[in-house]
């Protein structure tokens, strides 16, 4: 879930159908954006293999202190390394092989001068010690950082949420999406009065003599930096087991102590969700680390194996249905959407923020698939189609590369409708399911590019989808099917499309008669069997606009048919 889509997710963008929003001014990027978003030379030569993170959280003064011991593999010789840690946090020292290293700071990036030779293929270790007051999240999870909250009994409730802001907002690391450690330890020390829950499995709990407790969690799989999370509060715990495609998956639930009975009822949706998503996407990606659902004071976040939940135990999105169909009120949005990210976002991860659609389009599409699993195929389609009213077509879905810049919030609903449209083109649900499961298998625990995902879907479908991806991901256009129906003669063409766009589309010429037409940018004419002109429709499962050119001018507005 991303900060840029706050209004869209709430469904507060009224009356937007096919109209395009006013063009936004082009973004202006800085050196800081490049240092954050690109694989700089000081990053490119080393591969993070293990993070050993130890952090003490001090709620009395909202400070943290600790260190991250970074194990990395050398891929080329270098003398300088980039480590990211955001202001106002302070690096105390950086140590390798017992020697303190000199650094220079450039905003949120530290450039470490190395003393020891960096031999290609060797594994090395470096420890970064730091402290300070981390950025406080203004509007978590969208504008992220540390959250110093209290529960309804005014007890401390401390969590992190930092996908867009970056993990370096509270701990030092190589803060780029394309490099994940193979595993990670997360050891968090907090006052004894609270319980702390992080990613992976709990390995030890140490009660210290100074009134604090250290919780040591361990993740045995690759993990995104931004997925690493602190959750400290007055939690209670209960567990269950899901019999899944890879055997027994442990389910651990961490609601606040006074919400446990409510949680047991609401969290019963987890097993049907897992069953649905395993059937469509393949096995849950983290059997070794388990599945956790943790109550948080913010709305929610896809923290790997530790999904943050703050939907107030309501169905829908804070009790509302984003699709406007009613179907979304029959399940909990946060459980479904954020858990879908375990497949698309956590197991399959973008290399660059510009390709965020890989996370959000698929997770939003998963909402429709869950609706299909529980309410039927028609309801699933209606849910996805209902989300079109939230599409703005303001800027392209794909952002700018190398500067930590995601594109339009349309990556959610427009991206989901693009995938729903492609499903129609595949026109074979078994094959479509195979494509989705194949994505999960082929790119299991990998970072990827848009081109890889586009290429895989095109290859496995046997269709050249390049122009379709270009249209929906790289422009703000919606394909418009212009047509003229004169008796049994249908003339048609595509407009408002990228050059070479020739997507087939399904039409109905009677309530029971479906057929395909193959428009291009040039006019085509076909004879159709039509009993009544009003029986002609373009299948609404296609996200396109439709324009009848023979209607009177006053009625000739663009009408959303797909």
Model-predicted segments: where are they?
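A surface-exposed beta-strand-loop module
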Residues: 22, 81, 86-149, 524-531
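N-terminal, polar/Ser/Thr-rich
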Residues: 6, 19-65, 149-156, 466-467
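Amphipathic alpha-helical substructures
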Residues: 285, 408-490
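Hydrophobic helix-coil surface modules that form long, contiguous segments used
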Residues: 66, 160-163, 174-336, 365
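Surface-exposed beta-strand/loop patches in extracellular or lumenal glycoproteins
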Residues: 67-88, 171-191, 451, 490-508
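Acidic/His/Gly-enriched intrinsically disordered linker/tail segments
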Residues: 220, 356, 360-421, 425, ...
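Beta-strand-rich binding/interaction modules
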Residues: 90-96, 465-466, 481, 485-541
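Glycine/proline-rich low-complexity spacer/linker segments in large multi-domain proteins
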Residues: 32, 36, 40, 120, ...
């Amino acid at each position: 879930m991303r900060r840029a889509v706050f209004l869209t997710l709430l469904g507060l963008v009224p009356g937007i159908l096919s109209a395009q929003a006013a063009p936004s001014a082009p973004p202006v990027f800085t050196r800081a954006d490049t240092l954050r978003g690109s694989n700089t030379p000081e990053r490119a030569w080393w591969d993070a293999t293990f993070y050993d993170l130890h952090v003490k959280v001090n709620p009395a003064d909202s400070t943290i202190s600790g260190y991250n011991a970074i194990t990395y593999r050398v891929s080329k010789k270098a003398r300088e390394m980039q480590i990211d840690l955001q202001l106002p946090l302070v690096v105390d020292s950086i140590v390798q092989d017992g020697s303190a290293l000199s650094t220079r700071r450039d905003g949120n990036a530290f450039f470490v001068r190395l003393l020891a030779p960096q031999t290609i293929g060797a594994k090395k270790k470096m420890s970064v010690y730091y402290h300070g007051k981390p950025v406080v999240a203004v509007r978590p999870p969208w504008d992220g950082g540390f959250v110093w909250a209290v529960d309804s009994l005014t007890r401390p409730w401390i969590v992190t949420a930092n996908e867009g802001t970056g993990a370096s907002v509270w701990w030092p690391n190589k803060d780029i999406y394309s490099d994940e450690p193979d595993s990670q330890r997360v050891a968090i020390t907090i006052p004894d009065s609270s319980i702390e829950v992080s990613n992976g499995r709990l390995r030890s709990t140490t009660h210290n003599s100074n009134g604090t407790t250290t919780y040591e969690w361990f993740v045995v799989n690759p993990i995104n930096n931004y997925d690493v999370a602190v959750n400290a509060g007055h939690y209670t715990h209960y567990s269950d087991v899901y019999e899944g495609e890879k055997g027994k998956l442990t389910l651990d639930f961490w609601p606040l102590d006074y919400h446990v009975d409510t949680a047991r009822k609401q969290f019963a949706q987890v097993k049907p969700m897992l069953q649905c998503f395993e059937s469509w996407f393949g096995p849950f990606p983290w059997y070794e680390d388990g599945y956790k659902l943790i109550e948080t004071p913010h709305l929610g976040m896809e923290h790997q194996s530790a999904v943050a939940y703050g939907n107030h135990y309501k169905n829908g999105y804070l009790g509302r249905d984003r699709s406007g169909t009613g179907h979304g009120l029959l399940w909990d949005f946060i459980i479904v959407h954020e858990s879908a990210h375990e497949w698309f976002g956590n197991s399959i991860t973008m290399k660059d923020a510009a390709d965020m659609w890989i996370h959000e389009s698929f997770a939003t599409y998963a909402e429709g698939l869950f609706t299909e699993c529980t309410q039927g195929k028609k309801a699933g389609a209606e849910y996805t189609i209902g989300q079109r009213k939230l599409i703005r077509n303001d800027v392209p879905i794909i952002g700018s590369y190398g500067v930590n810049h995601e594109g339009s919030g349309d990556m959610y609903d427009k991206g989901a409708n693009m995938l729903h449209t492609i499903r129609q083109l595949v026109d074979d649900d078994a094959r479509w399911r195979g494509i989705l499961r194949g994505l999960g298998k082929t790119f299991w625990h990998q970072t990827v590019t848009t081109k890889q995902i586009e290429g895989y879907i095109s290859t496995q479908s046997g269709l050249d989808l390049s122009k379709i991806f270009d249209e929906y991901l790289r422009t703000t256009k919606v394909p418009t099917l212009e047509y003229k129906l004169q008796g049994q003669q249908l003339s048609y063409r595509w407009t408002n499309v990228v050059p070479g766009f020739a997507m087939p589309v399904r039409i109905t010429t009677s309530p029971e008669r479906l057929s395909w037409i193959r428009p291009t940018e040039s006019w085509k004419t076909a004879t159709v069997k039509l009993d009544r002109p009003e029986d002609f429709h373009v299948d609404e499962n296609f996200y396109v606009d439709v324009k009848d050119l023979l209607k009177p001018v006053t009625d000739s507005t663009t009408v959303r048919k797909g």
